[in-house]
């Protein structure tokens, strides 16, 4: 009986300690795909300062690219191919990684808040690649 009791305590401890506290929501918060829960400062539509026609849109439920129209990655037909969303928020830096088709392709972007109405897209070295202004 003592062995069963110790086993149950160990099992509960292992299960309780295996839950992730990575900052992403396991159930996606209010997001449409599990794991998607962007920081409030990035919610909105952001237009590229150079092209003035391309950009990104972030809502509580979706992440969209604006290029000759809008392509949303977490809704519609695209939601069916999304396997997993990983994200990391470190202060004013937000990284989103969308894994599609069980890992056969990955979309990853890192953004940094510069001001309330300005963000930058960072390259792999952490350098500013493009800047974006929040659409009013």
Describe the function of each predicted region.
Residues 4-5, 14-41, 136:
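Bacterial Sec-dependent N-terminal signal peptides
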Residues 11:
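Structured alpha-helical
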Residues 18, 47, 59, 133:
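Residue-level detector of conserved, well-ordered beta-strand and adjacent loop positions
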Residues 24, 31, 52-55, 66, ...:
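Beta-sheet ligand-binding and adhesion/scaffold domains
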Residues 50-102:
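N-terminal glycine/threonine-rich, aromatic-flanked beta-hairpin/loop signature
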